[in-house]
């Protein structure tokens, strides 16, 4: 009887230690994400929109939009902490994607459940909170849709990866737009702007150590090369590159355990 009681005490102590360690890890990770969100506040000046800390006065539904986008991003990142095997780095946020969703290469329509026919569900992105659209209804009644987002998410899911095993981000984390065309436009970030985003990219990669990093296109490849990290370059799916992207990402995924 005494031996049994001692064994139970040892087991209970071991469980308590593991639980405490897991709670500490979760707290540290959460602190890391919150610190990362604060870093994102420091966006460069000029024709750059910061969706997590700025209001798009012409196109946001209301002034709560930045806070909603921060919640979206926080939930998305927390879902993937400790389980990511693949990091995919794009160029910059687009006005049809992260500008309103708050998540790179992810459209409002994905979050609102309007891409289920493409095999993409809102819970693939996050499930801890309910998604909320931040754009007003005038421009796109069903929310904005981004072709790159649909192609990237759809391809990775069809290749059999669990959504928490991959995380999407951008070399330039904010939305660079054409000042003559307004917020609802995209442009390539300048070299000076890309340099301003380097710290955020480095912090992001430290948050999500993984087996493979994929660069979508030349801008992402250039930034990753500057950080001296190993990566696989694949064709960006935009501008007619979808077919080649699917072929190349399939090869990368086949090599991933």
Q: Predicted regions: what is each one?
A:
Residues 218-219:
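Alpha-helix/helix-capping structural signal
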Residues 29-212, 222, 227, 232:
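A polyanion-binding, active-site-adjacent surface
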Residues 229-255:
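Short, flexible loop segments at boundaries between secondary-structure elements
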């Amino acid at each position: 009887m005494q031996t049994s009681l001692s064994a139970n005490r040892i087991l209970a102590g071991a469980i308590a230690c593991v639980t405490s360690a897991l709670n500490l890890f979760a707290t540290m990770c959460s602190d890391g994400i919150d610190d990362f969100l604060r870093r994102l506040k420091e966006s460069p000046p000029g024709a750059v929109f910061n969706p997590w800390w700025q209001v798009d006065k012409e196109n946001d539904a209301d002034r709560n939009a930045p806070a909603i986008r921060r919640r979206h991003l926080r939930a998305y990142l927390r879902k993937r902490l400790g389980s990511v095997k693949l990091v995919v780095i794009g160029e910059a946020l687009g006005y049809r994607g992260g500008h309103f969703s708050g998540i790179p290469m992810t459209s409002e329509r994905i979050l609102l459940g309007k891409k289920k026919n493409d095999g993409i569900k809102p819970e693939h992105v996050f499930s801890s909170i309910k998604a909320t659209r931040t754009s007003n209804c005038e421009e796109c009644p069903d929310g904005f849709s981004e072709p790159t987002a649909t192609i990237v998410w759809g391809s990775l899911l069809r290749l059999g990866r669990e959504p928490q095993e991959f995380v999407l981000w951008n070399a330039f984390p904010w939305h660079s737009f054409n000042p003559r065309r307004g917020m609802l436009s995209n442009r390539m970030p300048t070299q000076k702007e890309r340099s301003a985003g380097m710290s955020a990219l480095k912090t992001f990669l430290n948050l999500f150590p993984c087996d493979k990093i994929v660069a979508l296109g030349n801008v992402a490849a250039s930034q990753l090369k500057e950080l001296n990290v190993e990566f696989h370059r694949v064709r960006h799916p935009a501008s007619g590159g979808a077919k080649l992207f699917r072929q190349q990402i399939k090869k990368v995924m086949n090599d991933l355990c």
